[in-house]
Amino acid sequence: MSTARFIKCVTVGDGAVGKTCMLISYTSNTFPTDYVPTVFDNFSANVVVDGSTVNLGLWDTAGQEDYNRLRPLSYRGADVFLLAFSLISKASYENIHKKWLPELKHYAPGIPIVLVGTKLDLRDDKQFLKDHPGAASITTAQGEELRKMIGAVRYLECSSKTQQNVKAVFDTAIRVALRPPKAKKKIKPLKTKRSRICFFL
């Protein structure tokens, strides 16, 4: 029996968007009621997706600026990134393009990204939005638009509290890691002897 392939999946995004809650919800089927900044221990377990068994390694990262130097150490060897923003935070949505995409392109170029909108249960919660005037709902269309803009492979929305779509997020990440999209080839001049000869003629 062959050993399961190891897949390293790293969550990235602003602080307090729900990255750690999403990981806890997926691995333990529980939802932490208090905000605790990144206390998720790296997790590894065998998971079956589409008949394939993989050893899924989950890595949590802290979004706060204090961790800007340490965070990229987690990116090494990543097979896929879950790039998360909150569906009730316009700032976290905008930071995907402003902060997180440039960081991932710099430290982990070419690694596929799955874009994830978190806190789905709160997006249509009128009472929550009324009690939090600063909250701004991000629509599915806006999420899909952002996915295209940053070149993410997929876009999903989930709620760690209700567990809606949480498993789908990680199943998608595994599928993407197993079958990464082919990079678009940039057309470069051929560096063959023949092309050099033609060039000088």
UniProtKB/Swiss-Prot annotation:
Residues 199-201 form a propeptide. InterPro entries: P-loop_NTPase, Small_GTP-bd, Small_GTPase, Small_GTPase_Rho. GO terms for molecular function: GTP binding; GTPase activity. It comes from the Eukaryota. It is found in: Cytoplasm; Membrane. Its main location: cytoplasm. Expressed exclusively in the root, hypocotyl and stem. One of its GO terms (cellular component) is cytoplasm. GTP binds at residues 13-20, 60-64, 118-121. The keyword Cytoplasm applies. Keywords: Cytoplasm, GTP-binding, Lipoprotein, Membrane, Methylation, Nucleotide-binding, Prenylation. It is a peripheral membrane protein. One of its GO terms (biological process) is small GTPase-mediated signal transduction. Belongs to the small GTPase superfamily. Rho family. PANTHER family: RHO FAMILY GTPASE (PTHR24072). This is Rac-like GTP-binding protein ARAC2.
